[in-house]
Design a protein with these regions (language model features):
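Autoinhibitory propeptides
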Residues: 1-59, 64, 82-176, 184-260
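Subtilisin-like peptidase catalytic core
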Residues: 173-187, 300-388, 394
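Catalytic cores of nucleotide-enabled group-transfer and carboxylate-activating enzymes in metabolic
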Residues: 216, 223-232, 261, 305-308, ...
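Subtilisin-like serine protease catalytic core
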Residues: 258-289, 294-352, 404, 439-443, ...
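Extracellular S/T/G-rich loop segment that most often corresponds to the catalytic His/Ser-adjacent loop
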Residues: 267, 273-277, 281, 428-524
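P-loop NTPase catalytic cores that bind/hydrolyze ATP
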Residues: 307-313, 387, 394, 398, ...
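Active-site neighborhood of phospho(di)ester-bond hydrolases with catalytic His/Asp-centered motifs
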Residues: 375-377, 407-412, 446-447
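Catalytic-core regions built around general acid/base machinery
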Residues: 391-404, 433-436
Length: 532
């Protein structure tokens, strides 16, 4: 390993930023005019009361002893501060959702909300009260438009009225809340959707942290009322996940495993894909073939390509020789079979969020004690919204925390190389931003750089591949996390054959393909080696 050079795993000094650790003093007086500032806070609380009065006839929480509202901190203050969080709790405000460093949704009982109004009034009138109110800039009623993904807002601005397939993320109520409150709120939300000509598209589901999701087809003109419901946290177009096509050629030489490698000692990677169909000579590398409960198996095409990139380093060079030296074993998690809930008869390859999440979670629960590395080479076909982390990106983060696993995720592919004439033009286009779930913050999103230059290609050697999506990620987070060498793509959509585009296909054939689907597994294999 000492001489093993992997340039895509190196972090240069230029990429490391030293950050000074500044200790924050909470006893400092901000020097605010108490009357002016207190009046602003009191007004905000009164507007929240007025807003609840306006929606009391239709809101999903109308009969519950709970108030959901937004707390905005002063510039420079952060919800990561423990003392500030404790102050909020003491004042009857329980954090429900931290939106960013300064904005959070909190919950309170109606009686504690009334008490909060009184205490803010005492602060305003300079009576004995908690001075920490100075760190709060405002109290606000959650804005319905602010809960909508940017693409939905754009459609509404154009006054579009057609039905849109959306996923509505509910606000997960704080721990200690009676679970029946959440259940009743969801029932009322579904009733509200149906009253507004909406159609439920699949059974409501929950993320691994308990966050409820309702998927429905709703006329755009009706989304404003639904978004304004206090139990609604975020509304975004339903996510669907696809893989890349490829072409195959007959294998030029037989494929044989290096007999000097002890297969049983190799590390293991779980491949979450369409299934694996290695030739008989390579089958010993597959620990198990598995299909989720009740699922139809995938066609094994894309999954075989991906698994070959996990199992073998510098695969193109090895295939030319015919003697393959493996570096990892594979758990074949065949999760990409037909999705009965996608409701996309014209695109049977697409899998919706609820189905994908259920299948991934089942795989993690089954294999988490055997491997900690899971490769996921599927993505949405459109860029992330960026205002909120994607549902699947969020779920992968939760699974990483709960079970100590790590996902290697393809950054996603675009087709801008078909319409743009230069790589520079591609990189300037907003449509090349990463696709979900590569916005996951705790896992590894992998992009592609070109390994070999071709005169027909738009990218030179070591340039960003002309199809590879780039950052930033959620709220400007740096993405992708890492890149690997890959094949390129011509303007006509042809993959020039070279060692970086070469991989194993189902049926004992070779394949030539380019895409971030095939760089993520390279990093998964690398990670398995260095983690052993």
């Amino acid at each position: 390993m000492a001489d093993d050079f992997r340039p895509h795993l190196l972090i240069t000094e230029d990429d490391v930023e030293a950050i000074e650790n500044k200790k924050q003093a909470r006893s400092k007086d901000l020097g605010l005019d108490r009357m002016k500032h207190g009046t602003k806070l009191s007004t905000g609380l009164q507007e929240i009361v007025s807003a609840y009065t306006r929606v009391q006839g239709t809101d999903s929480l109308r009969d519950e002893d709970i108030r959901l509202f937004e707390v905005v901190l002063q510039e420079g203050e952060k919800f990561s501060n423990k003392t500030l969080r404790e102050f909020l709790e003491q004042e009857g405000m329980t954090l429900a959702k931290v939106k960013d460093s300064r904005h959070a949704i909190v919950s309170s009982s109606k009686s504690k909300f009334d008490s909060l109004q009184q205490r803010v009034g005492a602060y305003r009138d300079n009576k004995r009260s908690n001075k920490k109110f100075q760190y709060i800039d405002d109290f606000q009623f959650p804005d319905g438009m602010g809960k909508q993904a940017p693409s939905i807002k754009e459609l509404l601005e154009r006054e579009a009225t057609f039905p849109l397939d959306v996923e509505i993320m509910e606000q997960l109520l704080p721990k200690g809340t009676d679970p029946q409150v959440q259940a009743r709120a969801e029932e009322r939300l579904i009733a509200l959707i149906e009253q507004n000509q909406g159609k439920i598209q699949a059974k409501p589901y929950k993320l691994s942290d308990g966050t409820p999701i309702v998927r429905a087809e709703i006329p755009l003109g009706k989304l404003e009322e639904i978004s304004g419901d206090t139990i609604v946290s975020h509304v975004a177009p339903t996510g669907f996940y696809a893989t890349s096509p490829m072409y195959t050629v007959q294998a030029g030489t037989p494929m044989t495993l290096n007999p000097n490698v002890s297969i049983d000692e190799l590390p293991i990677v779980a491949v979450l894909d369409t299934g694996v169909d290695f030739p008989l000579e390579l089958e010993p590398l597959v620990v198990e073939h598995w299909v989720p409960t009740g699922a139809t198996p995938g066609d094994k095409k894309h999954g075989t390509n991906v698994a070959s990139k996990v199992a073998f380093e510098n695969l193109g060079e090895q295939l030319a020789s015919g003697i393959l030296t493996p570096r990892a074993r594979i758990i074949d998690c065949n999760i990409r079979g037909l999705d009965p809930d996608s409701n996309k008869p014209d695109r049977p390859d697409l899998i919706c969020n609820s189905t994908m999440i259920a299948r991934i979670k089942e795989a993690v629960l089954r294999y988490k004690d055997i491997t900690k590395i899971f490769n996921f080479s599927s993505s949405e076909e459109t860029p992330i919204q960026g205002d909120e982390i994607s549902i699947l990106g969020y779920e992968l983060d939760v699974l990483a925390i709960q079970y100590g696993v790590k996902f290697t995720i393809s950054a996603g592919n675009h087709y801008l190389y078909r319409s743009q004439d230069t790589l520079e033009d591609i990189l300037k286009d907003d449509d090349n931003r990463i696709a979900a779930p590569a916005d996951s913050m705790l896992n590894i999103a992998v992009g592609a750089i070109v390994g070999a230059e071709h005169k027909e290609g738009l990218s030179r050697q070591y340039d960003v591949a002309p199809y590879s999506r780039i950052g930033p990620g959620f709220r400007g987070f740096r993405k992708p996390d890492i890149v690997s060498l890959a094949g390129t793509m011509t303007k006509a959509g042809v993959v020039p054959p070279d060692e970086y585009a070469m991989m194993i296909a189902s049926g004992g054939q070779w394949a030539f393909q380019a895409g971030t689907s095939f760089t993520a597994p390279i990093v998964a294999g690398d990670l398995a080696e260095i983690s052993q």
